[in-house]
Amino acid sequence: MNNERYYLLTGAAGFLGTNICMQLLEAGCKVRALVLPNDKSVKYIPEQVEVVLGDLTDAASLEPFFTVPEGCTSVIIHCASMVTVNPNYSEKLMAVNVGGTRNIITKVLNHPECEKMVYVSSTGAIPEEPHGVKIREVNKFTPCDPKKVVGAYSQSKATATQMVLDAVSVMGLKACVVHPSGILGPNDHAIGETTGTLLQIIKGEMPMGMQGSFNLCDVRDLAAGTIAAVDKGRIGECYILANKTVTLKEMCDMLHAECNAKQIKFYLPLDLADKIAAGLEKQAEKTGKMPLMTTFSVYNLARNNEFDYSKAENELGYTTRSYQETIHDEVQWMIAEGLIDGTGVTEKHAEITDGQVSEGGFFQEFDVKEAYQSVEDSVVDTYKKIEDGAVSGYKKVENSFVSGYKKMEAAFVRKFLSREGESVEETKKRLSRK
């Protein structure tokens, strides 16, 4: 009897999915990947992987993906999702991230040979704690508090995570959840937000930095932690896969040390960056272009990014490597891919396909002169408002001080210098004649 286990993987052509594929193959596992029809990114999936065409939002198209030979078993890692830095609600986003997860859950329940599901959520789905408090796993995600789960993407992941946990408790679904933080490292063929940001820094195209911090993990560590959850993750439990925080300045310094990337000299305070981003978003509404940066991007630097990932360390054997090691390996990958030559960036650009939704780096793609002018205009406008407010405030203080001084002077003259029946002005005139 054939008792082979199939590893079913959605999102196999994405950044995390590709690395999961490679690690499963290295372990001698049989991997089947779900890929959108006409998705050009299929070329990045290792050739040993069995590719099945299907669409998360089309339940019927998922049946061949779930059907394995008689006598075989399967497990599924549901990694696919639509990612966006746009904080606003999107029907497509909800259809893919929530509706697609619902379809996966239904298929797992209808296929008893599918022994377990690992749902790849996000740390963004977990309600944020105040600064100074490490964020830990929770078991309730809805209703979402928009002040603690910010942005449509995070809210869609929170909704889908709750759906998985409800299916565990109500329908007997055998599943657990992993919450990756930001992703960093080699093999990002779609050039996602983080890799795009690194390329912009290396190119010298980031006009200025921002204060604040990220929480980024090496994609290979995330892949290993996700795979470990298949056999070690407890049913109905959630596991944070995160790292220590790193500032944008620290990241820039590491890139400078690794490949002589141009150093950024000015880092915007976050409150000023938020005002500028809001102005750029309004400008983008008029022009129809992507804003240079968004308030949501600024929020991700300003928010509490400290996570407690000890549960994953203790139960899954999850480990993290240093940022320096990851940066070194990613730069070497960029050189091997022809994205940079060790001293600068080449003209080659990776394809971005429908199957790998990406919106560029932390600062979106832009014309450098136009970008500098846009930021300069916003900075000047913001400082002008601050200056106007300061001048107005100083005038009010000055007027108040002068008025108070005059009252004090009059009281002094009246009490110590004036003769009986003499006014303050008469006293001043008399004294001035002496």
PLM regions and their residue ranges:
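Active-site Tyr-X1-5-Lys
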Residues: K148-C176
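Substrate-positioning beta->alpha
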Residues: E193, M210-V230, G236-E237
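NAD(P)H-binding glycine-rich loop region in Rossmannoid oxidoreductase-like domains
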Residues: K40, V49-G99, N103, K107
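Conserved Rossmann-fold NAD(P)-dependent oxidoreductase catalytic core, especially the SDR/UDP-sugar
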Residues: E91, G99-G151
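Mid/C-terminal beta-alpha module of Rossmann-like enzyme folds, strongest
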Residues: G225-M293, Y309, N314, Q324-G355
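N-terminal Rossmann NAD(P)H-binding glycine-rich loop of SDR-like oxidoreductase domains
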Residues: R5-A27
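Conserved catalytic-site region of short-chain dehydrogenase/reductase
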Residues: V85, T123-K134, I183-N187, G192
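NAD(P)-dependent short-chain dehydrogenase/reductase
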Residues: M171-V177, S181-F214
